[in-house]
């Protein structure tokens, strides 16, 4: 799969831009702050319905504009599709596929798949658990787009349950009066049902990614491993099937109910879990060097690419200013590993930041213009 044409209107710094794209490597080169990342960010948005840089859509709309539009032509084998997303901050976004407006934004998931390498990837190893949960859930959705609905259901139920718990906590603090918590039982069931499906997918994903990540780390840093991925659930237990995970979550919610009412927040569930990344016998966070942490983060992304490619729809590889963060050895090894990709999009401040093995199409980016060299 590859993108053959990218069109942006009022997206980030671009009033309007048209970028023809070929299979193989394409590099966008120009000084920082000129809009290189905006181009690959738009491609990533088509794949995830979100940005790797900001948490809301508002910053994606050019200042003074009401909406932004991302449009892309995508080819998979002999099949071509036209995807369009209209970003409307404060209102519902809109989507079109092959000019049909009878689709929801979520329906475009799976048409474009990307694996993004970016400076922010270091947070996968050194950052908070939320970074690792996001890594798992975005990859789950790339494998199975319907999981976007499950994630949305879980977030909605979690919000409703937290509202009820917060009200109960406030009522208890003010005068000692109690609330009818019978509806909490219903929310527990909804939360456990969606949570169990999400957990089952996460556990299956980790089992698939583990050997691929270990192989990728060995390719990047020979003799430096092994690496191991270990899921750390907030609801204790060894369950793996969806049914057993449901029972495990229900038991954990019952056990935590008194404390949750006191604190006014849900304390167990996938939103509180973590992924432990081990290097050798030690956790990478806190023990791995800066270089080892980079190798680990890159290995996770390479494993994601290998997994999606093996499942039949090769993703677009996006390397956003990542080579400038790496030493010469890691830079060359990463370039050699991604070069065979069907489509590789690279951004760099200067030509020298793009390894020679990634020779291909070049665009210069400056002052809102994108020109092919």
UniProtKB/Swiss-Prot annotation:
Keywords: ATP-binding, Cytoplasm, DNA damage, DNA repair, DNA replication, DNA-binding, Nucleotide-binding, SOS response. Signal peptide: none annotated. It is found in: Cytoplasm. SUPFAM superfamilies: P-loop containing nucleoside triphosphate hydrolases. It holds the Pfam family SMC_N. InterPro entries: DNA-binding_RecF, DNA-binding_RecF_CS, P-loop_NTPase, RecF/RecN/SMC_N, RecF_2. ATP binds at residues 30-37. One of its GO terms (cellular component) is cytoplasm. GO terms for biological process: DNA replication; DNA synthesis involved in DNA repair; double-strand break repair; SOS response. GO terms for molecular function: ATP binding; single-stranded DNA binding. Coiled coil: none annotated. The keyword Transmembrane helix does not apply. The RecF protein is involved in DNA metabolism; it is required for DNA replication and normal SOS inducibility. RecF binds preferentially to single-stranded, linear DNA. It also seems to bind ATP. Belongs to the RecF family. PANTHER family: DNA REPLICATION AND REPAIR PROTEIN RECF. NCBIfam families: recf. This is DNA replication and repair protein RecF. It comes from Streptomyces coelicolor (strain ATCC BAA-471 / A3(2) / M145). The lineage of its organism: Bacteria, Bacillati, Actinomycetota, Actinomycetes, Kitasatosporales. The gene is recF.
